[in-house]
Amino acid sequence: MKKWNQIIIDRSNKITKVNKPKNFKDFSEEMGGYDVNEYFKSKKSFFEFYFHGRYVIWSNYLKSSINPFTKTLSIASGNGINELDLISNNFNIICSDLEIPQCYEELKKLFGHFDYLKLNILKDIISIEFDNIYSISVCYIFSDQNLEKFFINVHKMLKKNGILILDSGGGEDNLTSFFFIDIYLVIEAYLIYYLSKIFNKKIGFKFDNNFGYKRKNREIKKFAKKFGFEFIDIKEYDYLTELQRSILIRKIIEYFPFSKKVFVSLGKMIPYIRMFKFKKI
């Protein structure tokens, strides 16, 4: 495991360092907010705005991995993009998060009643036993100590032979990600910042020292095994998201679309989506 620091280019015209721990509001803002907006007018407008890109990848994987007639708990559901797609396809999904989002009541008007629980997976345990539990793009924020708590509590809430699906929430900790994220992106950010001063542009960046953690595949498997899970398989998807953290790469793809295939090939070394499937033993 290694600390994952993120750089975000913005229009602040300064370099900002962020060290504070994140709360539910921070995560909500990172995901675009959970408030009701103009896209809550209908199911169609909701899905057209929110359900695309990696959300489609996640939903397709979940549909192929979960029996719709079994009971499934979603950890950190947010505004329920994947969950509502599954519910619309007759899956039995119970949502949960640190707080129930403000948009919950409005979503029930669109999609009908569905359960949403206030749940801190690091502290709380539900008395209900589930056939499946899944967690999408969450475990990257957990320290080793918190990841242990996560596996312990999930194990208690799963039936015997129950399935845990875990998305890592970012590329693997390897040499490629180290050179790209910890070296190249930092150099690129400083170059853009100082060049913006020469050309009198208001460009700055935020250096988030508390973004999360990166882990090797074998580290996640080791944690799961330690706390009573058998590894079934891993599927990897989305080979561009990590690389597109670079402004230069985004511009190259924009102006030279044929280059996308090259970057997809390179991105296979740091896939953004890593779907782990485990069974409780």
Task: Describe the residue ranges of each PLM region.
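Acceptor-substrate binding/catalytic loop of class I
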Residues: 203-219
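A short glycine-rich, Lys/Arg-flanked "PGG" loop and its adjoining helix->strand segment in the class I
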Residues: 148-160
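A conserved beta-strand element that flanks and buttresses the S-adenosyl-L-methionine
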Residues: 134
